[in-house]
Structures are given as structure tokens and as C-alpha cells.
């Protein structure tokens, strides 16, 4: 039985719409849930899902949607999310609301609910949408329907099996990788968020089929206070977690040089069948929660370099708390994925044009006054240690000896087909909202 379609090309939903699907030679898919940007963590909370809406409008304003296939994914089901997450945790997320939160207060500590991860209207549905888009993107990859799949609403890398963490409730990345492992022998996970990708590392800490590589700020205190070099995996996954702990203020040349000098030998040694690239934009200069000095060009160069290996790739978002720069970065990186050069001058017709005042440019100067504490010697030591760790991998692992993770769709095929039929019947309205 063929795997049922789980997302809808926009031309099937509304022909002639702004988001219409147009087949292109470049096999890039863009997985867009138009509702995911409508959720609100709270007035003073730094996480603003609306950044996804701004990003999408900028992408469309540049006409990049004409260079890729845009899909509207369905939300992830409880069953799909429970392939990684504990059912009691998911049940809590499904039932709790701001109105009844007091009834669940005794569970807050257990599930790490608080200031960082509050209960807001639609917490569960927001997580379903983010996870659903990453799962949909992973399906397109494993079915051979695309070479690069993009979900900017994904990348929520801190969520654990049974608790929320760091603004993340459901780990869409882990769910997508589990699905990909059913078809791809080895998956390389790369994380350029300023925060350590602890949730993904923890999920695959004993596995030699997933190699996690995280470039992040680390001083033993900066959230999540993990990701030192000595965290390198256990049991069968020993040496399959590679951490690159950095100090404040790293700039473009240092970062991109270090990234390339580690990622190239990593790919050559591990020989991944697919790559998941988490593009957290809080590593940019002037981020509200960041302490690096990266430009949008440098951040995008990591995407460009990873793309150059021509390996099937899932690209997701992540952190990023200065909204206009998040949208700029992810739009620019979308242009890299479709191999399209776009001008720095922003398109005037985009709905959020005035949001980018006063410069109205894709590449503002983002260098800050944060002192660069990364010495050339320290970075060279990191590079050498990374190469030494790669030597222990002994080449690509013997996949035949490894257990394949459970089928994310297997026993859910009938439900999946039913949900897809319902989705098509609804003829979802995908008109751009002005």
C-alpha cells in the first residue's frame, strides 16, 4: 500500500492563489502551516510565533515561492507525537488551558511548565502544527519527492520526551528524524542555534545511526548549561554526539571557517544518507537573547556549505528573538536552498515592509560591541578535538546490526488516510491575509 499523502499542494486547494504550487526543476519543498504564526506565548515572552508569518510574507514578496513547491501540512496526531513523547505528557498538553491551569498545577513541575514554557491558548495545537510540518517535510524526503524540505516553524530542539524546555513543547526534529531513519541508514543533525541542541542529542545519545553536531555558546551556565565537548554519547552512540562549545562574540570569519573545517570531515567520515539542519537565528548579532556577532550572510553560508554536499536535507528554524532579523535570515536561507540570488533591497509590496525600517534591507549591519572571547588558539583546539573524535567513529556504522525505530505511520495508516481525505474535503483557505 502506498504511503498516503499527508499534505496538500496549494494548487489543489485554491487554484491561482498567491501560494499556488508550481512544479520546478529545483526540488525544494516549503511546508507552510498558515495558522502557526497566530499563537501567542504572552506579551513579555521572547518567543513570538508571528515571526513565521513575517518570514513567509518576505519569502513570497521576493517571489521565492515560484522556485519551490509549497505544501500545506496537516497537524501531527497524538499517536504520531507519542512515537517519541510520553502519552501522559501529551495528554497534559492536550487538556491544559489558561482557564483550567489551576486544576493541573500539581503537574507543572513534573512537565517543566513555567515562565519559559507557559500554558497559552492553543499550546497543544501549536505543537501539532510545528511537528506536523516537520513530519510532512520528512515524508517528502523519504518518498524521494524533494531534495530539500523547509519548515521554518520547526526546530524546537529543547523539548524532551516527557517535559517542555526552552520554549519548546514537542520536539519536531526528533519525530522527523525517527521517520527518516525508517528509510535512511544514517542521519546527520547539525545545529547552529546559539543554544545547545540538548533535546535532540539526548534522544539519540545511545544511537550510532544519528550523529548530532551542535555549535553553541557554552560556559556551564548559559541555557541549557549542556553541550561541553566531553558530552559525546554513550553505549552504542559513543562518539556520535559532537559538541562545539563557543564563547561570546564570535564573528563571521571565525564561525564559518570553524563550521566548514568540522562539517566537511564529519560528512566524509559519517557518510550520512540525509541531513537535518537546525537554523536557529539567535546566533545572529543583535539577537535579544544572543551573544554572538554573526551576520545574515555568515549564518546563510552555513546553509550554503551544507547544501553543497547534495545530500537530502531537512531545513528547520529554531531560536531567534529579534523578529525582523529572524525573518531576514530565514528568507535569505530560503533563497540559498532554491539557489536564487535576491537583492538586498526588500520588496516594497511585502505586507511587513515598514517593519524593517529604517534601512529596508535584507542584510543590515549586525556586528555588536560584544567582546570576542574566542581566541584563535581556542578555536584551533576545538577543531583538533573534533577531528580526533571523528577518528573514533571508524567509518560509517553497520546499519544492518541496528534496530530500525518504530514506523511512525505503520499502524496509523488508516487514520492517516482518513485525515488526509478530511483535509482535502475542507478545501482549506490559503489566501494571503492582508
Swiss-Prot record:
Residue span of region Histone deacetylase: 26-339
Keyword Transcription regulation: yes
Pfam families, per the entry: Hist_deacetyl (PF00850)
Keywords from the named record: Chromatin regulator, Hydrolase, Nucleus, Repressor, Transcription, Transcription regulation
Family: Belongs to the histone deacetylase family. HD type 1 subfamily.
The protein's role, per its UniProt record: Responsible for the deacetylation of lysine residues on the N-terminal part of the core histones (H2A, H2B, H3 and H4). Histone deacetylation plays an important role in transcriptional regulation, cell cycle progression and developmental events. Histone deacetylases act via the formation of large multiprotein complexes. Is not essential.
Protein name: Histone deacetylase phd1
Annotated source species: Schizosaccharomyces pombe (strain 972 / ATCC 24843) (Fission yeast)
Name of encoding gene: phd1
Amino acid at each position: 500500500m502506498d504511503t498516503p499523502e499527508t499534505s496538500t499542494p496549494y494548487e489543489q486547494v485554491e487554484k491561482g492563489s498567491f501560494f499556488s504550487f508550481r512544479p520546478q526543476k529545483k526540488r525544494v519543498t516549503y511546508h507552510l502551516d498558515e495558522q502557526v504564526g497566530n499563537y501567542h506565548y504572552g506579551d513579555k515572552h521572547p518567543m513570538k510565533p508571528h515571526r513565521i508569518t513575517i518570514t513567509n510574507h518576505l519569502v513570497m514578496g521576493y517571489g521565492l515561492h515560484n522556485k519551490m513547491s509549497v505544501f500545506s501540512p496537516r497537524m501531527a496526531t497524538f499517536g504520531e507525537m507519542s512515537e517519541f513523547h510520553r502519552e501522559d505528557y501529551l495528554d497534559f498538553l492536550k487538556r491544559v488551558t489558561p482557564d483550567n491551569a489551576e486544576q493541573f498545577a500539581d503537574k507543572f513541575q513534573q512537565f517543566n511548565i513555567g515562565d519559559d514554557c507557559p500554558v497559552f491558548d492553543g499550546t497543544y495545537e501549536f505543537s501539532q502544527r510545528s511537528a506536523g510540518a516537520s513530519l510532512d517535510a520528512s515524508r517528502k524526503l523519504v518518498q524521494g519527492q524533494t531534495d530539500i524540505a523547509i519548515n521554518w516553524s520547526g526546530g524546537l530542539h529543547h523539548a524532551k520526551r516527557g517535559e517542555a524546555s526552552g520554549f519548546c513543547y514537542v520536539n519536531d526534529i526528533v519525530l522527523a528524524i525517527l521517520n527518516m531513519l525508517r528509510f535512511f541508514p544514517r542521519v546527520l543533525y547539525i545545529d547552529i542555534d546559539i543554544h545547545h541542541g540538548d533535546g535532540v542529542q539526548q534522544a539519540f545519545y545511545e544511537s550510532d545511526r544519528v550523529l548530532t553536531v551542535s555549535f553553541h555558546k557554552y560556559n556551564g551556565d548559559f541555557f541549557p548549561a549542556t553541550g561541553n565537548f566531553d558530552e559525546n554519547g554513550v553505549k552504542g552512540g559513543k562518539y556520535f554526539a559532537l559538541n562545539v562549545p563557543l564563547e561570546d562574540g564570535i564573528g563571521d570569519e571565525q564561525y564559518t571557517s570553524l563550521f566548514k573545517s568540522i562539517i566537511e570531515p564529519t560528512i566524509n567520515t559519517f557518510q550520512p544518507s540525509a541531513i537535518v539542519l537546525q537554523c536557529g537565528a539567535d546566533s545572529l548579532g543583535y539577537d535579544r537573547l544572543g551573544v554572538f556577532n554573526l551576520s545574515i550572510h555568515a549564518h546563510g553560508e552555513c546553509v550554503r556549505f551544507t547544501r553543497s554536499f547534495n545530500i537530502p536535507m531537512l531545513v528547520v528554524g529554531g531560536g531567534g528573538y529579534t523578529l525582523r532579523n529572524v525573518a531576514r535570515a530565514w528568507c535569505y536561507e530560503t533563497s540559498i536552498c532554491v539557489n536564487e540570488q535576491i537583492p538586498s533591497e526588500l520588496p516594497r509590496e511585502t505586507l511587513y515592509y515598514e517593519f524593517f525600517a529604517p534601512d529596508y534591507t535584507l542584510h543590515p549591519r549586525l556586528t555588536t560591541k560584544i567582546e570576542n572571547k574566542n581566541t584563535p588558539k581556542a578555536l584551533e583546539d576545538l577543531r583538533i578535538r573534533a577531528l580526533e573524535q571523528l577518528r573514533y567513529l571508524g567509518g560509517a556504522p553497520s546499519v544492518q546490526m541496528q534496530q530500525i525505530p518504530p514506523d511512525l505511520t505503520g499502524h496509523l495508516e488508516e487514520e492517516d488516510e482518513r485525515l488526509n481525505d478530511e483535509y482535502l474535503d475542507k478545501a482549506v483557505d490559503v489566501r494571503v491575509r492582508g
